[in-house]
Amino acid sequence: VKLTNASYFIQDEWKFAPKWTVTPGIRIDHHSSFGTHTSPSISLGYDVNAKTNVYAAYKEYFLAPTPYQLFDGFNGNRNLKPETGHEFDLGVHHKFGKTWNSNLSFFSRSTKDKIGWVMTNPAAFTGQYRNFDTEKAHGINADVRKQLTKHLSARLGYTYTHIDATPTRKANRDGYVPKHAVNAGLDYNDAKWDAHLDIRGIINRPGTADNVFPRKTYWLADISANYRVRENVTVFGRINNIFDTYYAEQSSVRWGNPGDWWPGQGRNFRLGLEVTI
């Protein structure tokens, strides 16, 4: 089976008044199996002052099933429909000073024929990709970044997500999408070195039943560094899950036995050399 998908996109930013900017756009997808789909978008921005900008944006989208979702011998479903939907965003960018930047936004999204995997035979642990009912979601994104020194910066972000339950799935896609997520970090950059501390917090991950996941709330920390020996030679190192936190992002407890999780990786290390030719 041969599938082709050609996409074309054009947008134009138009400053139609001293403080106002509008950016219309359009994307056209032509899929060999699902035809032609047109997805418009538009955003409107207003500069309140030199430090603050507010904006509103609307976009539509089309997402065809992947070849794996369609044709895999165990999970595939040739009757899948493409996902279509729209999203609305409303937000504000604000600079508290020369070294402080912040963003706050609200989003609302509606997806028709959302594609997801469904267990069809718990005894054999086999399933199939299917289209769900319309999926509606809304949430908040907030982040702030501070330049501490010439080379060192800090960042903090928070996301709240709520995905409505459907007749076949509970809220937040059976708990696989957390309600609250926190991201924080430190970044160091200079001519030779860059180093990063990344912290991720998953808070209140709901599930279809008790103990679907070993922890509903957990925190992970990673650290990495790169040293540029020459323009085309870099030595790198990384420690993932520094505190060896036990967690799982996939689970079969609903269909199997207590503790049937796919745990995430424990503490692990990477060290290497990258040469660009």
Language-model segment annotations:
Residues 3, 53, 60-112, 118-147, ...:
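Outer-membrane beta-barrel signature, preferentially recognizing the C-terminal barrel domain
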Residues 19-22, 51-54, 98-102, 151-154, ...:
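Repeated loop/turn-to-beta-strand initiation elements of outer-membrane beta-barrel proteins
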Residues 10-12, 42-46, 90-94, 142-146, ...:
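Residues on the lipid-exposed face of transmembrane beta-strands in outer-membrane beta-barrel proteins
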Residues 34-40, 67-73, 114-123, 161-173, ...:
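Outer-membrane beta-barrel translocator domains and adjoining extracellular loop/strand segments
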Residues 1-31, 39-41, 59, 151-158:
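Surface-exposed extracellular loop regions of Gram-negative outer-membrane beta-barrel proteins
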